[in-house]
Amino acid sequence: MSEKSASNNKAEFKRQSSPFREIISADHPIYKPAKGRYWLYVALPCPWAQRTLITRALKGLAPIIGCSVAHWHLDDKGWRFLEEGDGKTNERHWFDIAGGISSVNLNTSTPVANIPNNAHRLLVDGTDEPHYGYKRLSDFYFKTKPDYKGRFTVPVLWDLETCTIVNNESSDIIGIMNSAAFDEFVGEEYRQVRLVPRSLEAQITEFNSWVYDKINNGVYKAGFAECAEVYEREVTSLFQYLDKLENLLDKKYTDLEAEYGKNNKDKILDRYFAIGDTLTEADVRLYPTIVRFDVVYHQHFKCNLATIRDDYSRIHTWLKNIYWRHEAFQRTTDFTHIKLGYTRSQPRVNPIGITPLGPKPDIRPP
């Protein structure tokens, strides 16, 4: 979410490549599957980090891979962790779906005018770092590579045995978690979860490709544009692809209505997903952007030609279905962290740092 280094000299947003791209597998010479060996470092405002939290929950890996949550405020030194003296962390919080952060259970954001950027409420603003007492995410980057020169991004998948970063690319991390690497440590119900079924792999890959470039990254291309011409081009493109997504989901919903009848909404929603008739990686990758759209991207990134809730009925139905019916999505979504993280951490976009109260509710009832 850092601003300055993310833009090139043509006023266009260019995302930095992730430099750490190892995998975990029984055949890997170093990084082999083990319970308790790996740790996930995230920040809840970040949509890329949320992908990994969702996958960790869906695959039953929360007890296997611990998690620490950075403070929601990203300053010029990067993400930071709370100090242990700010409270007491029970070990079980590290293996919770959202790292023990309490406000994920609220389903709404709270007024934040009286919350300073240096707020230090343990398990509210973030968690401590339990292994080394590190105060900054950057410490992990320098521990792995002392001459590291890049940005300090989340998520980070860390190896406690070798004290190195395994991977800091969210798409790789969800692939590692979705592989069979950790199957021996989870129950059969989680072994059966395959977010990229072989029969749908080509469809999911194609869907993910344009969703990433035009929607996931599209909001950033618009929000971090440094001239009006680039902004207008990127916003127009973004909404063209939201239209494409709406049409895709409309066809899916209409087909399900024809199969089950318009009044049989429970059966329709049981199979109403982006690709196929079960949850897949397509839903995992799409959700973090859509759940943030009305709450921050519409106003903060000026993606304001339309809202999801009022102008994209099929996407909105999909969003509510995913959020309210699937704990892995709901309990990794913290609207207060999301709103604070964007509006307080990007002064070029929002110089005064005022966090809008609306829209309310952050997500509408099912």
Swiss-Prot record:
Keyword Transferase listed: yes
Active-site positions on this chain: 46
Keyword hit for Cytoplasm: yes
Induction behaviour: Up-regulated by tert-butyl hydroperoxide (t-BOOH) in an MSN2/4-dependent manner.
Entry's Gene Ontology BP terms: glutathione metabolic process
Family named by the database record: Belongs to the GST superfamily. Omega family.
Protein name as annotated: Glutathione S-transferase omega-like 3
Annotated source species: Saccharomyces cerevisiae (strain ATCC 204508 / S288c) (Baker's yeast)
Lineage: Eukaryota, Fungi, Dikarya, Ascomycota, Saccharomycotina
